Amino acid sequence: MKTHHANLALALMLGLSSSATAVAADAPQAVATKAAAPNVKPVAADAHGVIPDGAPGMCARSPACRATAIPADAFVRTADLGRLTDADRDALAALGVKLDIDLRTADEEAQSPDLLARDDRFDYQRISLMGTEKMDLQKMMTSFPDSLGEAYVQWLGHSQPQFKQVFQRIAAQQDGAVLFHCTAGKDRTGIIAGLLLDLAGVPKAEIVHNYAISAHYLEGQPKDSDERADHGAGQAEPGDRPQDGGHGRYRAGQHGAVLAALHSQYGGAEGYLKSIGVSEQEIQQLKVRLGQAG
């Protein structure tokens, strides 16, 4: 995996219009075409790479952050992959994606099947970060506190077995890029990305920007999780609740509060992973993938 230095640290899929096409890494128009979400200041490097025409999230390879060298082809983050074209799948294969981790519930997957799951070029695994039964999700949502930051901290505690499984599966992947996605491409993927970035020693401000910029790119996207939550389907994520403002209104300070709580309660991502049963060897393997060891 090649190592590059720049702004965001991970190869990401961030939400853009499904009709978008490829964007050059240094093209300022890529960030000037959409109004930024509150508290977000996009830079040209935030839009970079190949954009699947059929996906509600773009396939964007974010260059590595300024302070920490992370392989630019280590991870890909995206939204729902139920509308990928053949060309989209070819583009992901060309990016080196080998593993697709679907963070959605069984109901979400049934409503919009992941099209990489039936492509032999990709290994597919679904690990729901929101529980296994609809009633569990509804109970979890009603118990969330008013603060989105507090909700994320509770989420880290509530879904420890699922987080453990996700990071163990990533650690076990020896080659290629690891793609992880949910429905909206923001909350579940965002918290996984945040933990990876923190494990790599990325500065807090850049982790917050990494999360908040997704709201910028999600502007104008169908609020699938919001709509399903309104109809009682039980698939809402914390940031999709009406009191949290939905997509595009995320307050960056809230994610900063999550990071502060992560360090206060667990000593950071590494401490959290150890507390949920991820082994020292697996953490070392994660660091190798992140370009921080080996």
From Swiss-Prot:
Keyword Hydrolase: yes
Keywords: Hydrolase, Protein phosphatase, Signal
Keyword RNA-binding carried by entry: no
Compositionally biased spans, kind Basic and acidic residues: 221-231, 238-247
GO molecular function: protein tyrosine phosphatase activity
E.C. numbers: 3.1.3.48
InterPro entries: Prot-tyrosine_phosphatase-like (IPR029021), Tyr/Ser_Pase_IphP-type (IPR026893), Tyr_Pase_AS (IPR016130), Tyr_Pase_dom (IPR000387)
Range of residues in the leader sequence: 1-24
PROSITE patterns linked: TYR_PHOSPHATASE_1, TYR_PHOSPHATASE_2
Annotated Gene3D superfamilies: Protein tyrosine phosphatase superfamily
Catalytic activity of the protein: O-phospho-L-tyrosyl-[protein] + H2O = L-tyrosyl-[protein] + phosphate
Record-linked PANTHER family: TYROSINE SPECIFIC PROTEIN PHOSPHATASES DOMAIN-CONTAINING PROTEIN (PTHR31126:SF1), TYROSINE-PROTEIN PHOSPHATASE (PTHR31126)
Family: Belongs to the protein-tyrosine phosphatase family.
Name of the protein described by the UniProt record: Tyrosine-protein phosphatase
Organism: Nostoc commune
The encoding gene: iphP
